[in-house]
Amino acid sequence: MRELRGEEGGVEERVPTGARPVRALARSPGPVPDHGQVWSPGVSRRLLARYYLPQRHTTLQGNACRLLRDGVEAYPEMLEAIRRARRSIRLETYMFVTDAVGELFGQALAEAAERGVHVKVLYDAVGSWTSRRSFFEGLRQRGVDVRAFKPFSLSRGLRHLFRRDHRKILVVDGTVAFTGGVNIAAHWAPEGQGVAWRDDVLKIEGPAVHELERRFLATWRMMFQDRLSRLRRRIRGGVSAPEPGPQRGDVGLAVLSSRRSIHRAYLHAIQRSRQSVLIAAGYFVPDRRLVAALKDAAKRGVEVSLLLNGGKSDHPFLEHATRAFYETLMGAGIRIFEWQRGVLHAKTAVVDGVWGTIGSFNLERLSLAFNHEVNAVFADPRLGRELEDSFRTDCGDCREVDLAVFRRRPLWQKAVERVLYFFRKVL
């Protein structure tokens, strides 16, 4: 692996084609307009990575990536990979619910273990608190090494309770990986006429798979090996995982598992935006630096649009805290779209149709200060365009918030928003 350390002056900048100043807030709902291409097609992906990604981030070139929408698209691909596994399966998830989807995955994992595949499953004890213990015990009896991340204990205090494993990683045979916002639960692929939670998963083949597997193994060993064993491993050279596989495509990816590095990647890309910043966030309670970066981008004439929950969130208190930011953001020219088809759970962003990120990181306090997270970050025109098209399509199922109408909301609603904003760090 080699870290790309391009200088800021080393990237030839071009005037964005078709760029437009931020318009006055639209009075009627409508899709986010497509402003066209920012970069010349001749600009290399390596130069784009140098421009949009902080210098300290290691970018792995040569990946093949596919964007999967909701569990309806992601689960069949994940299950097929598990059923084809021959050597190893690593599954890390916040929620492993013992419903129809959980049973389906459990059966596939157990069958893999029974045919000799080395299967490790790490689920978060709090995120999966409703799941039956007998389900996981049944997996163990069939050969699956399944363990809970930090079961709650009163003796360990609230800080231990807040530090959760929020990652979603599946790595099979060291050759294919999946990461994004989708857990293992029927929320993302309901039976009958139910509406799936809106989310995204990135399927990866290539050198970046190694990095996701390495992150999984580091967490596993941190949690379940004694201190002496961990010390010996550090002396021998750290966490081992299969060497990176051959190149499968042309996408450069950085795998970020530090909370601060993910936050820094967001800020860096927004500050360098030239035409558009499109963020889909199921949970959005931004810190001051992110608010300032978004407002500054809008003042520069960059199109800034947010896709947020619209009254159907699984965390309604957090949604009220989010609305405390609306006037400030819309007053700066930022457009806000509220998702109307069920729960929005996505954690994606795309800048200039080039830089993008998909992962588990939410733009709120728990992800920034406590949780274990992982995001894939890329600078690729094809994948960026695909993510941007998905965002713009989703806006067709949204209600755009009108600033004048929003200001006339009831006084009690304003009071609730302010109170919950005050407690935003613990929601």
For each feature predicted by the language model, list its residue ranges.
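Charged, low-complexity intrinsically disordered terminal segments
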Residues: 2-5, 10, 14-427
